[in-house]
Amino acid sequence: MNQENSFKVLLSATRRGARLARLLSREQLRSWGRPFETAEHVVAELANNAVQHGHVPGRSFRLTLTVSATDTLRIEVTDVRADRTPPAEPRPPAPDAEGGRGLLLVAALADRWGTDLGPVPCKTVWAELPAPPSR
């Protein structure tokens, strides 16, 4: 019988916090015996977006990882900028743009992704992907 695993951490809304989110997610998934390569990329993009678009001085962002009994990994990154939500359908940036591809990557790697608002002033950007136990 499968059980649900969950991990939650508050991190500084800085580039260092985003990097730590990626490293912690990799180690947590590894400790649960779950694949981490794809999830690590998704966490990196969502955490970077929280730092870049959801930053409020002195406030943190929260990373939550949950593996359900059906072997689905849900990645959630919560910040305090509900007034800055990502588009439901990410659009490709200009060819010469240096950024703007993160949500396109998340959409390509995840089975599903979206945004939940609340509690005020927060928003959570989430993604779900398969996480079968490693053999």
Show the residue positions of the predicted features.
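Conserved beta-strand-loop-beta-strand hairpin that lines the nucleotide-binding pocket
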Residues: 1-8, 51-135
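STAS-typified acidic loop motif
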Residues: 4, 9-20
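Alpha-helix initiation/capping motif
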Residues: 10, 14, 32, 95-96
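Conserved short strand/loop->alpha-helix "switch" segment adjacent to the catalytic nucleotide/phosphoryl-transfer site
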Residues: 22-44
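Histidine-centered phosphotransfer motif of kinases
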Residues: 38-56
